[in-house]
Amino acid sequence: MAPKTPDASEIFHALAGNWTLVRDLGEVGQFTGDVTFHAADPDQPNVLRYREEGFLTRPDGKRFDGYREYDFVLHKDPAAIELLFRDPLSFGNRYVLLQFGEEGDAGESGLCARDIHPCGEDFYHHCMIWNGPDHFETKIKITGPKKDHLLHSIYRRAYHPERRDILS
């Protein structure tokens, strides 16, 4: 019997907790850091706050600290996870709406969700690949007159002694 394919709700609830992040930014460098998904408000169980913090290391060796925040909102109809910006310029605006259900591209395992975010004249082709409760990836291909590069992020569950249930 084939294993059950997780739905958006199962993926959403599995995100809660701490993760490590490695993001390849191509010629720009690499971002490494930590990510936390936590309940933003006890009265809104369908919202997880995402916060990443870490360092961008450029090819010339210079390092810069940085962070980013989103709200991940679980929707039931259609079953999806919506990412909302939290930065001051775009606060509350939709980044992408992820509906899981397709297989990953050739050479990828996992369940994939895709959406496109327009940003001025550029487009962010977002793909989230769910490999299980301890590992997921995002691939964001940015195209347009101002940008043309790929952001590949790998998320792995961070080890915490009090959460032995999430270890594999």
Question: Which residues does each PLM region occupy?
Answer:
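Soluble ligand-binding/transfer domains with enclosed cavities or grooves
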Residues: 2-168
